[in-house]
């Protein structure tokens, strides 16, 4: 996809790149040539799944400094794909509900798009698959995704240390766990430093 981006557009992980990736996944799912590409939830459906019907959603983007990037990568034990962090805040009737981040990662050879829902206390509440462009046998089940949720040490989100494997899906497990750790570490570093 990067070959189709205009010069000057930040690649891999920038808010525009993530949006374009999500739209590309939607188009790929609509193509008769891409029978295995599957969009599971549109963005508005995902936000409703995260915060419930009637929530007000606002988008925020933070620039990540080189010092913050180093701290996030050390905490997450993975590399960041962007120097920007885009997240959404959900509110209903003035009450803060939490955060959501839409991320995309290459699993084996194709893109998966997922959303990480985080409480106001920075605990992962849900991980929701939005699009999965690999064969269905590599797609994690909802019960597997629940391993990524809850208040647990970051090392428990590392494959082989706290996550059960998915037979034949090591790259899927690695991609999703890397993404969730990066989101969680980004919140811990960026929001605790001064929201």
Regions found by a protein language model. Give the residues of each.
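…; additionally, a secondary subgroup of soluble metalloenzymes is captured
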Residues: 2, 34-35
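Short intrinsically disordered, low-complexity segments
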Residues: 7, 29-34
């Amino acid at each position: 996809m990067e070959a189709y981006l205009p010069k000057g557009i930040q690649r891999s992980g920038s808010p525009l790149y993530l949006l374009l990736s999500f739209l590309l996944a939607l188009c790929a799912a609509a193509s008769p040539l891409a029978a295995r590409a599957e969009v599971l939830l549109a963005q508005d459906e995902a936000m409703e799944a995260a915060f419930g019907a009637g929530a007000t959603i606002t988008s925020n983007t933070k620039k990540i400094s080189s010092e913050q990037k180093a701290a996030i990568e050390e905490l997450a034990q993975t590399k960041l794909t962007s120097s920007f962090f885009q997240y959404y805040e959900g509110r209903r009737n003035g009450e803060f509900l939490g955060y959501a981040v839409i991320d995309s990662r290459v699993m084996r050879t194709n893109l998966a798009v997922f959303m990480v829902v985080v409480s106001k206390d920075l605990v992962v509440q849900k991980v929701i698959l939005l699009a999965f462009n690999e064969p269905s046998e590599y797609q994690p089940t909802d019960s597997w995704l629940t391993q990524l949720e809850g208040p647990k040490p970051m090392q428990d989100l590392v494959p082989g240390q706290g996550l059960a494997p998915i037979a034949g899906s090591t790259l899927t497990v690695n991609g999703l766990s890397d993404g969730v750790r990066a989101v969680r570490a980004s919140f811990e570093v960026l929001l605790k430093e001064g929201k």
